[in-house]
UniProtKB/Swiss-Prot annotation:
<feature type="binding site">
    <location>
        <position position="318"/>
    </location>
    <ligand>
        <name>substrate</name>
    </ligand>
</feature>
<protein>
    <recommendedName>
        <fullName>Fumarate hydratase class II</fullName>
        <ecNumber>4.2.1.2</ecNumber>
    </recommendedName>
</protein>
<dbReference type="GO" id="GO:0006108">
    <property type="term" value="P:malate metabolic process"/>
</dbReference>
<feature type="active site" description="Proton donor/acceptor">
    <location>
        <position position="187"/>
    </location>
</feature>
<keyword id="KW-0816">Tricarboxylic acid cycle</keyword>
<feature type="binding site">
    <location>
        <begin position="323"/>
        <end position="325"/>
    </location>
    <ligand>
        <name>substrate</name>
    </ligand>
</feature>
<feature type="binding site">
    <location>
        <begin position="138"/>
        <end position="140"/>
    </location>
    <ligand>
        <name>substrate</name>
    </ligand>
</feature>
<dbReference type="Pfam" id="PF00206">
    <property type="entry name" value="Lyase_1"/>
</dbReference>
<dbReference type="InterPro" id="IPR008948">
    <property type="entry name" value="L-Aspartase-like"/>
</dbReference>
<comment type="function">
    <text>Involved in the TCA cycle. Catalyzes the stereospecific interconversion of fumarate to L-malate.</text>
</comment>
<dbReference type="GO" id="GO:0004333">
    <property type="term" value="F:fumarate hydratase activity"/>
</dbReference>
<comment type="similarity">
    <text>Belongs to the class-II fumarase/aspartase family. Fumarase subfamily.</text>
</comment>
<dbReference type="GO" id="GO:0006106">
    <property type="term" value="P:fumarate metabolic process"/>
</dbReference>
<keyword id="KW-0456">Lyase</keyword>
<feature type="binding site">
    <location>
        <position position="186"/>
    </location>
    <ligand>
        <name>substrate</name>
    </ligand>
</feature>
<feature type="binding site" description="in site B">
    <location>
        <begin position="128"/>
        <end position="131"/>
    </location>
    <ligand>
        <name>substrate</name>
    </ligand>
</feature>
<dbReference type="Pfam" id="PF10415">
    <property type="entry name" value="FumaraseC_C"/>
</dbReference>
Length: 462
């Protein structure tokens, strides 16, 4: 492999000749051969956006030259356009501040900027990775800013639209299924009736609440640490830098980013990420419940509940011919399990900072962005390949409805709870209908039973 010599404050390092990264990135590659999980692409792009905003702010404040800002901007745009995707090889399992990944970005942008300027790789003139790309920044404020920017962008552009689309599909189903009366179930046992539309309306409401929690979490993610520099004091940054840089990021992203009012919290804690993960976990709990309900309702086709049909997308067994499984439900619930685990990691990592800095940021970023991506993808997949094709099975719904012993609840007001319980237990013991049993016990006439036990009248207060 052909190499070139790069240097940092510890000396010279050989770097692949075609690489845009420099000495500190290469040291990290050499020292942290742990796993294969690299930092997510949205985080890389967010960090490039941070550098672009910083350059624009610094030149406006007279801290770097216009030529340097222009070159950094061009290089950052190359990153954002995907032209340098292969230049960020570092694994998650590195320094907990993300310093090596911050320097990876600084080195790549500096080398690309100097290549554009015609001075070539490793020249670091006219653009230096620390003095110009990283000007008025520390990893300690740039990296958490990138986490917030990446998470906010991904939640807004990927997750929220996916959840809304699934929510809207389920809402359409709820409206279409409104006239269909079915038996309810609690504790996996028969309960009183409701409509299939009411059942689905519960799913819609869960997702509405989930969207609300995501929007609440975004409020904290919009607060940026940039300008806190090393420990939150803003050392080596212009007094106006923090506010202007946040405003520039808001302009570049189209999202309402602001400078965090307290930089010590913004560097020392990762509470916004923990809260966002909590919202993701709660959304996962909702989606897990919805997917489980749907696969139970679709169980069968002959020996299960079978009250609804879901699309048949692929063969389900390598040995049982004709078997089809609820695969979208299974994929969704596996995603939810992963998100639950990610939340545990993020919670522990967020709680483990010391004094002025949290040093678990790469693992927080990795798990947070994975949860966002997986939930968004899973909602899109579940919506497209399952939810839109859900259809009721009226004959199965009607069978269970009229064979349920819990219709006896409608008799409470007429014959009392204890007598109604006697009817249900006797009917079950003798394998007879509720109507027949109530008449045999002398508690009601058949006509009275028919007037009282009307499933369609049991789905609302009366």
């Amino acid at each position: 492999m052909n190499t070139r010599t790069e240097h940092d404050t510890m000396g010279n390092v050989e770097v692949p000749s075609e690489a845009y990264w420099g000495a500190q990135t290469q040291r990290s590659r050499n020292n942290f051969k742990i796993g294969g999980e690299t930092l997510p692409q949205p985080l890389i792009y967010a960090l490039a956006l941070v550098k672009k905003a910083a350059a624009a702010t610094n030149v406006s404040l007279g801290r770097i030259k216009p030529e340097q800002a222009d070159l950094i901007t061009q290089a950052a745009d190359d990153v954002l356009n995907g032209k340098l995707d292969g230049q960020f090889p570092l694994v998650v399992w590195q320094t907990g501040s993300g310093t090596q990944s911050n320097m990876n970005m600084n080195e790549v942008l500096a080398n690309r900027a100097n290549e554009i300027a015609g001075t070539g790789l490793a020249a670091y003139q006219p653009v230096h990775p620390n003095d110009h790309v990283n000007h008025a920044q520390s990893t300690n404020d740039a990296f958490p800013t990138a986490i917030h920017v990446a998470a906010a962008i991904e939640i807004n552009r990927h997750l929220i639209p996916a959840v809304k689309a699934l929510r809207d599909t389920l809402d359409k189903k709820a409206q279409a299924f409104a006239p269909i009366v079915k038996i309810g179930r609690t504790h996996l046992q028969d309960a009183t009736p409701l409509t299939l539309g009411q059942e689905f309306s519960g799913y819609v409401s869960q997702l509405d609440h989930g969207l609300g929690r995501l929007n609440d979490a975004l409020k904290d993610l919009y607060e940026l640490a940039l300008g806190g520099t090393a420990v939150g004091t803003g050392l080596n940054s212009h007094p106006e830098y923090a506010e202007k840089a946040a405003a520039k990021l808001a302009e570049l992203s189209g999202l309402p980013f602001v400078s965090a009012p307290n930089k010590f919290e913004a560097l020392g804690g990762r509470d916004a990420a923990v809260a966002a993960s909590g919202a993701l976990k709660t959304l996962a709990a909702s989606l897990n419940k919805i997917a489980n309900d749907i696969r139970w309702l679709a169980s069968g086709p002959r020996c299960g509940l079978g009250e609804i049909k879901i699309p048949e997308n692929e063969p389900g067994s390598s040995i049982m011919p004709g078997k089809v499984n609820p695969t979208q439900c299974e994929a969704m619930t596996m995603v939810c399990c992963q998100v639950f685990g990610n939340d545990v990691t993020i919670g522990m990592a967020g709680a483990s900072g010391n004094f002025e800095l949290n040093v678990y940021m790469p693992v927080i970023a990795y798990n947070l962005l994975q949860s966002i991506r997986l939930l968004g993808d899973a909602c899109n997949s579940f919506n497209e390949h399952c939810a839109v094709g859900i259809e009721p099975v009226p004959e199965k719904i009607d069978y269970f409805l009229h064979h349920s012993l819990m219709l006896v609840t409608a008799l409470n007001r007429k014959i009392g709870y204890e007598n109604a319980a006697k009817v249900a237990k006797t009917a079950y013991k003798n394998n007879k209908s509720l109507r027949e049993t109530a008449v045999e016990l002398g508690l009601l006439t058949g006509e009275e039973f028919d007037e009282l036990v009307v499933p369609a009248d049991m789905v609302h207060p009366r």
